[in-house]
From Swiss-Prot:
GO terms for biological process: cytoskeleton-dependent cytokinesis; protein localization. The keyword Lipid biosynthesis does not apply. This is Septin-8-A. Residues 393-420 are annotated as: Disordered. GO terms for molecular function: GTP binding; GTPase activity; molecular adaptor activity. It comes from Danio rerio (Zebrafish). SUPFAM superfamilies: P-loop containing nucleoside triphosphate hydrolases. It comes from the Eukaryota. Belongs to the TRAFAC class TrmE-Era-EngA-EngB-Septin-like GTPase superfamily. Septin GTPase family. Residues 321-407 form a coiled coil. The keyword Lyase does not apply. GTP binds at residues 49-56, 104, 185-193, 239, 254. Keywords: Coiled coil, GTP-binding, Nucleotide-binding. Residues 101-104 are annotated as: G3 motif.
């Protein structure tokens, strides 16, 4: 079908037809539910906050279980992220939960780059998913999605204002992940201070342009509850897995000399609000927002870096095939250019090597001639010495013969004199 036919067909007025009998596609929601239950779900939580602020305790409280917790020291050289994955089941629903802890966050004297390991970790999970998506033979159905769906940002209950580290970190993260700020250990400040602290936090977030996750209000089923919960941000929470008896009931609470703070009592803290909003009402929206907003932004930026765009410089539609051909042509041009540069470089290198070899050959020849002349000079000197030595030997032999002749002639002369 031609493109024009598709355009004409898409612009036609849609008609509502009545069915003459039962067809069966009304079971599609049931099919989707059955498939989802069989496949299971994954949910990934990033907990950002200082050491000892109560991140692990809150996770245990949220999911009503005891996760593996390792005590973290306040003397870390830097920030590193520690992911832990657990398989949970509630009724017949399976959930693969990953909790990522930021170990050492806020413990260094120089906190200027404390956010970088967190940003790098989030980008790495996006990159892993993108690489799987770009494979020719991909398997997203079985792929363990590690993209962060929610960042719970734990704010210290100072009662005054946000720390610079908090503002910088949330600003760096707000375009990459859904952020829900929460005031940790909210039972350490009074209700009046807590109310003022919440207002101060939201004011500072707005003035610094930090975008936090807003519970969606476009779905009529959750519009009312989400609208009211947006007004309670940031949530002031208290975590505890200890059970305390209050009256005739046993509740999760924190026991103090002055009284008991009940975790699930909404007049004491916002824990129930956080749990409802995070898990019961908006968990799927957080997953969708991660994929449709944050991951798509990362994917678009990456593809644009690679040269893939939806429009050409004249803002005309540009298909993937055209982009591929343009990139292929550009790549081949660059390849030919580099081949020519390498060939020219090789030729120049060969010429330089030949010149160096010729120079070495000339130097060796000159050295050989010099050695040859030196050898001839030494040979001449040796020959001259030999001749001198032979002449001296001949002269010596002559003197020797003369001396022997003289010594023989002396006795004969004496005998002759005696006879006379």
């Amino acid at each position: 079908m031609a493109a024009t036919d598709v355009d004409i067909f898409s612009n036609e007025e849609k008609r509502n037809l009545s069915l003459g009998g039962h067809v069966g596609f009304d079971s599609l929601p049931d099919q989707l539910v059955s498939k989802s239950v069989t496949q299971g779900f994954c949910f990934n939580i990033l907990c950002v906050g200082e050491t000892g602020i109560g991140k692990s305790t809150l996770m245990n409280t949220l999911f009503n279980t005891m996760f593996e917790n390792e005590e973290a020291s306040h003397y870390q050289n830097g920030v590193y992220l520690r992911p832990r994955t657990y398989d949970l089941q509630e009724s017949n629903v399976h959930l693969k939960l990953t909790i990522v802890d930021t170990v050492g966050f806020g413990d260094q004297i120089n906190k200027e780059e404390s956010y970088k390991p967190i940003v790098d970790y989030i980008d790495t999970q996006f990159e892993n998913y993108l690489q799987e998506e770009l494979k020719v033979k991909r398997s997203l159905f079985n792929y363990h999605d590690t993209r962060i769906h929610i960042c719970l940002y734990f704010i210290s209950p100072t009662g005054h204002s946000l720390k610079s580290l908090d503002l910088v970190t949330m600003k760096k993260l707000d375009s990459k992940v859904n952020i829900i700020p929460i005031i940790a250990k909210a039972d350490t400040i009074s209700k009046s201070e807590l109310h003022k602290f919440k207002i101060k936090i939201m004011s500072e977030l707005v003035s610094n342009g930090v975008q936090i996750y807003q519970f969606p209000t476009d779905d009529e089923a959750v519009t009312e509850i989400n609208s009211s919960m947006n007004a309670h941000l940031p949530f002031a929470v208290v975590g505890s897995v200890e059970e305390v008896k209050v009256g005739n009931k046993t509740v999760r609470a924190r026991q103090y000399p002055w009284g008991v703070v009940q975790v699930e009592n909404e007049s004491h803290c916002d824990f129930v609000k956080l749990r409802e909003m995070l898990i019961r009402v908006n968990m799927e929206d957080l997953r969708e927002q991660t994929h449709a907003r944050h991951y798509e932004l990362y994917r678009r930026c990456k593809l644009e870096e690679m040269g893939f765009k939806d429009t050409d410089p004249d803002s005309q539609p540009f298909s993937l095939q055209e982009t591929y051909e343009a990139k292929r042509k550009e790549f081949l041009g660059d390849l030919q250019k580099k081949e020519e540069e390498m060939r020219q470089m090789f030729v120049n290198k060969v010429k330089e090597t030949e010149a160096e070899l010729k120079e070495k050959e000339r130097e060796l020849h000159e050295k050989f001639e010099q050695l040859k002349r030196m050898h001839q000079e030494e040979k001449r000197k040796v020959e001259e010495k030999r001749r001198e030595l032979e002449e001296e030997m001949n002269a010596f032999n002559r003197r020797k013969v003369a001396a022997e002749t003289l010594s023989l002639s002396q006795p004969l002369k004496k005998d002759k004199d005696k006879k006379n």
